[in-house]
């Protein structure tokens, strides 16, 4: 029997070398109570962010509510806020909730103190996308304060613009559809803001995307706030960065979900899983554990 069927997983104790100066001992709640409630992931841990070089100028700040399902068959969704800083030639996209947690840690007087684990569902990705050529620098935080993976991507979109229209927050929008990396999408974009961008790495339309959903219902971005606000788009300075290719990243991302214990140990992280009674489980049971896998990019 699979270990996820025989245990109500409540805690992962993580001790030892986490390649982080934040803490020497961490215990994170993993609220994965049963097979039918397999919605939890390893939490994305806050980190200290330092401002780096200025990459460009933003004209807008846009917030999207982002609902996603950790497992395709799940009835429940987790929610995040994805913020983009939008300029004519550059867009930066990241989890606003995670940025708030990062900011709290960055300005904390004692950065080694025990910290609150953020809510689940916060995206561990952030993006810098050059709108002149589509070149996108992708950053991914590996679980539990592991190294950060960075790779270059140049996504392309083959949108079909339809005649359907609707109004979103006072903006007239038009419907476009496409298949992108294994998923079918519907996007509502506004020509009133003629910048080819959207949440995360999406774009490729003659206007800003205000709403985006996968047809299978597992990923959905809706406009939460749109402000015309000038400012610098700043590159964050982070530590423990490992540059990889996109295929290398995809291989890691799949392994950390399908074989999390082995993958994290290969990073130098020592993981001690427990059942809901607080008992450490056997090695054989630990290596059988999996995390729900429903990436926004299937290919």
Which ranges hold each PLM region?
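Bacterial Sec-dependent N-terminal signal peptides
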Residues: 1-50
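Extended soluble regions of mature proteins
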Residues: 42-299
